Amino acid sequence: MGTSGKCVDGNMNGNGEGDPIQSSNCTNSRTQRWSFGTDATLRVQNMCMRPASEPPSPGTLLQARACDQGPYQNWLYRSDSSLINAASGLCLTDPGALTSGPSQLSLASCTGGANQRWTFT
């Protein structure tokens, strides 16, 4: 899963719980193999993507957390390729999409920009 030629990376330096979710160069590592679950979660290595704080506001960073079916772990994939956090209405955003290095993903108001369009491979 990625945007602007970069891949979403769960990082997972520790056990995964609370690790930041970032975009980085695509390496096909297991921490970049995200799936969209039938329960509307974004998953990697048995962890789910969710905001670092609740309720989130624009600029809230994203983390990997244990999947608990909480409302802030649910996402909507729209026809314009944006991913919306169902509980907040904010879009998954890569603020560093145009940079070459990694950047931590966050939530932002939906603008339809290239840094909010996601593809699954």
Name each region found by the language model.
Residues 1-121:
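Lectin-like carbohydrate-binding module/patch detector with strong preference for beta-trefoil
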